[in-house]
Amino acid sequence: MRYISRTVWVLSLVSLFTDMASEMLYPIMPIYLKTIGFSVALIGILEGIAEAVAGLSKGYFGKLSDNRGKRAPFVQLGYTFSALAKPMMALFVYPVWIFFARTLDRLGKGIRTGARDALLSDESTPQTKGRVFGLHRGMDTLGAVIGPLLALLFLYFYPGRYKVLFLVAFIPGLMAIFATLFIKDKPVKEQEAIDKIKTGSFFSFLKYWKTSPADYRKLVIGLLFFALFNSSDVFLLLKAKEAGLGDTAVIGVYIFYNLIFALFSFPLGILADKIGLKRIFIGGLLCFAAVYLGMSMSHHLYAIGALFFLYGVYAAATEGISKAWISNISDQKDTATAIGTYTGFQSLCTMLASVIMGFVWYRFGSTVTFVLTGSAAVLVAGYFIFLPTFARHE
């Protein structure tokens, strides 16, 4: 795989270790917070604030990375913050401290995302971006498979030792920090470094929307419209639980989904480079629609398992592909800003989608909620079908 550079492999390993640490804690986070006195409402506020911080900071730090002409420092600092936040959650149980630690974790994600994806873009060509972003997403998601399995194994031998698990999760976080030390920036030409010091306000990245290429805006409008209907995966797990699956089976289908996501990301990236990013992305949207429409009427373990398989294919066909697509139609000097602006808005839309889906579920039931979501995905797929192809390899 000559087109996969050393930097891409390092970034992929860093993401694997980081996601391993995060996903070790994901299944037990709500349980731990409730044991230290957090109400469901307070947990919701905590996650909402954390996601808002992550979303807004992605755009700002993406633009800052472009302005400074640097990628590595943002990647290193971002992953360090996220790693340090894990054991901090176990040190004290005061709500203010928990809010600080959780926000630090998401701030780390905001700092690194734009710069990391710009590095991936810099290390690829229009002909290889699908497979480069696909490999990275696959390794990242492999961590999401290993993490919960390690957590289940730990809690099997040490039930209820949640604080210790937070400390154990620091180990892969440390490995990620160490790996980031091998990431180096490419030299920036002197002419390209002119006026790089001006950074602007925290919301200055929003100005990029006005000056960005029209093709970028058309693409991102479609992506954000989809994000408004693409709520948290928690709702799929709740639907599986409602259909009669036990706790172990629910965790099992979640791990299965991540495994399929990891296995299919790189092959679909290769296929996207051959037949076009747009075609693979639309195929992913149709998989998403099939999953939500299918979940609205499925009540058997095997049917739900098949739908979670399809959900893993959807994720592999869209998550890395969308960033590769954006980087293909953005100027190289603005790549971090372009991706950071999109992922920032995407985080906010996803948060809003979860609120809307929760309300619709409460008011009209899960079946109506899933049918509406699946139908909306079909409409978004139609938008992309009629969207012009912007570049040779889309």
What are these regions (language model features)?
Residues 101-142:
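Cytoplasmic helix-loop-helix junction between adjacent transmembrane helices
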Residues 172, 179-195, 385-394:
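Helix-loop junctions on the cytosolic side of multi-pass membrane transporters
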